[in-house]
Swiss-Prot record:
<keyword id="KW-0479">Metal-binding</keyword>
<feature type="binding site">
    <location>
        <position position="120"/>
    </location>
    <ligand>
        <name>Zn(2+)</name>
    </ligand>
</feature>
<protein>
    <recommendedName>
        <fullName>Endoribonuclease YbeY</fullName>
        <ecNumber>3.1.-.-</ecNumber>
    </recommendedName>
</protein>
<dbReference type="Pfam" id="PF02130">
    <property type="entry name" value="YbeY"/>
</dbReference>
<dbReference type="InterPro" id="IPR020549">
    <property type="entry name" value="YbeY_CS"/>
</dbReference>
<keyword id="KW-0378">Hydrolase</keyword>
<keyword id="KW-0690">Ribosome biogenesis</keyword>
<dbReference type="GO" id="GO:0006364">
    <property type="term" value="P:rRNA processing"/>
</dbReference>
<feature type="binding site">
    <location>
        <position position="130"/>
    </location>
    <ligand>
        <name>Zn(2+)</name>
    </ligand>
</feature>
<comment type="similarity">
    <text>Belongs to the endoribonuclease YbeY family.</text>
</comment>
<dbReference type="GO" id="GO:0004222">
    <property type="term" value="F:metalloendopeptidase activity"/>
</dbReference>
<dbReference type="InterPro" id="IPR002036">
    <property type="entry name" value="YbeY"/>
</dbReference>
<keyword id="KW-0862">Zinc</keyword>
<comment type="function">
    <text>Single strand-specific metallo-endoribonuclease involved in late-stage 70S ribosome quality control and in maturation of the 3' terminus of the 16S rRNA.</text>
</comment>
<feature type="binding site">
    <location>
        <position position="124"/>
    </location>
    <ligand>
        <name>Zn(2+)</name>
    </ligand>
</feature>
<dbReference type="GO" id="GO:0005737">
    <property type="term" value="C:cytoplasm"/>
</dbReference>
<dbReference type="InterPro" id="IPR023091">
    <property type="entry name" value="MetalPrtase_cat_dom_sf_prd"/>
</dbReference>
Length: 155
C-alpha cells in the first residue's frame, strides 16, 4: 500500500490539498513504476520554519519553496527483498506561503503550484536532480509530462 503521512505545521491546510497531493503522487508513482508498498511524508510549513530547516540541513540561510530528504540518497544499497516492510522514500517539506506567492507570480492556481512542488519533491526522492543542465532538462521534462498527463496544467 502506498502511504503518505501528512503533517500540517501551519494550521491552514485544507482537506482538499491532502487529497490532491495524494492523488497526484499516486499517479506519479505509477508513472515512475514505483512499487505499491512504499511510503513518504509531506509536511506543510511557513517561511520561518522552512528557512530554519534550510539553514540547519542544507547550510542555506534563506526561504525556499520545497525541500526533500531522500532516505535512500546517501545510503549504500541494502537488499530488503523478502522482508515485509515498505520502501520508505523520504520526506517532502512544502512552504505554503511561498507556494501562494509563486502561484501569483506565475499566474496559475495555488493548486497547480502545490501539485508542482509536491511532484518536484517526489521526483527528488526518486533520485532526480537539477544540478546540471542535462539533469534539469530531464527532471523538469518529467515533471511537465506527469503534470500534463494528470491534468494539472499551467492554465
Amino acid at each position: 500500500m502506498f502511504t503518505i503521512d501528512f503533517s500540517d505545521h501551519t494550521g491552514l491546510v485544507k482537506d482538499a490539498w491532502y487529497k490532491q497531493i495524494e492523488d497526484l503522487l499516486e499517479f506519479a508513482k505509477k508513472e515512475e513504476h514505483i512499487e505499491d508498498d512504499a511510503e513518504l511524508s509531506v509536511t506543510f510549513v511557513d517561511k520561518q520554519e522552512i528557512q530554519e530547516i534550510n539553514r540547519t540541513y542544507r547550510d542555506k540561510d534563506k526561504v525556499t519553496d520545497v525541500i526533500s530528504f531522500a532516505l535512500e540518497e546517501d545510503e549504500p544499497e541494502i537488499d530488503f527483498s523478502g522482508l515485509d516492510i515498505p520502501r520508505v522514500l523520504g520526506d517532502i517539506i512544502i512552504c505554503t506561503d511561498v507556494a501562494q506567492e509563486q502561484a501569483n507570480n506565475y499566474g496559475h492556481s495555488f493548486e497547480r503550484e502545490l501539485g508542482f512542488l509536491a511532484l518536484h519533491g517526489f521526483l527528488h526522492l526518486l533520485g532526480y536532480d537539477h544540478m546540471t543542465e542535462a539533469d534539469e532538462k530531464e527532471m523538469f521534462g518529467r515533471q511537465d509530462t506527469i503534470l500534463n498527463a494528470y491534468g494539472l496544467t499551467r492554465d
